[in-house]
Amino acid sequence: MDFIISFIKNLFGFLTIKKVMILGVENVGKTTLLYNIYKFYSENITTTTLSSLPIPIPTNGFNVESIVIEQVKFDIWDIGGKETNRICYRHYLTSEIDSIIFVFDSSDINSLEESKKEYQYLKNQISLKNVPFLLVANKQDLKQQTIEIDEILKTYFDKSSINETILMSQNNNDDLIKCINWIFSN
């Protein structure tokens, strides 16, 4: 039945819609990642809209941006990482999610334990059992990083449960392209 619906949608030019969630604890760069993806790939972006994009501040609630790539519309949700937001976003964790990008700050040792707990919580959700996860080790460009990324992954994250890991610096378009390619392929 899904095949028939998909065929009819494609026949009449309808878009496939994919829901992507960007999750993680606070101050890890989720909103910056969302707007960098939007800036990089939005087909409708102009100089005016680029300058009017919000300066990322800690998100209270959520942000949603949509981009279209090759007949696929991606609704990308960035949900604030404060504990009060994380309690609320758990209501959105359904099997309708197509992929999850879990972001953590690889330069902040103090936030890694909290990130580990949140990641484990998400991976244990039955509704997310078949949802692919991308683990983004963000802020690779910051000099205060004292632990190597392999050590972080070994200590704080179950490598066997990770579909893919991307080391990211927000100013590096190659990292951003890897992230976007992963979203598109999952």
Swiss-Prot record:
Return the GO cellular component terms, semicolon-separated. Answer: cytoplasm; Golgi apparatus
Q: Which domain of life is it from?
A: Eukaryota
Q: Which residues cross the membrane?
A: none
Keyword annotations of the record:
GTP-binding, Nucleotide-binding
- Kindly list the positions annotated as binding GTP: 24-31, 78-82, 138-141
Give the Gene Ontology MF terms in alphabetical order. Answer: GTP binding; GTPase activity
What are the top taxonomic ranks of the organism? Eukaryota, Amoebozoa, Evosea, Eumycetozoa, Dictyostelia
One matching Pfam family is Arf
Q: What family classification does the UniProt entry report for this protein?
A: Belongs to the small GTPase superfamily. Arf family.
- What InterPro entries does its record include? P-loop_NTPase, Small_GTP-bd, Small_GTPase_ARF, Small_GTPase_ARF/SAR
Q: What does this protein do?
A: Binds and exchanges GTP and GDP.
* Gene Ontology biological process terms in this record: intracellular protein transport; vesicle-mediated transport
Q: This protein is called what?
A: ADP-ribosylation factor-like protein DDB_G0292332
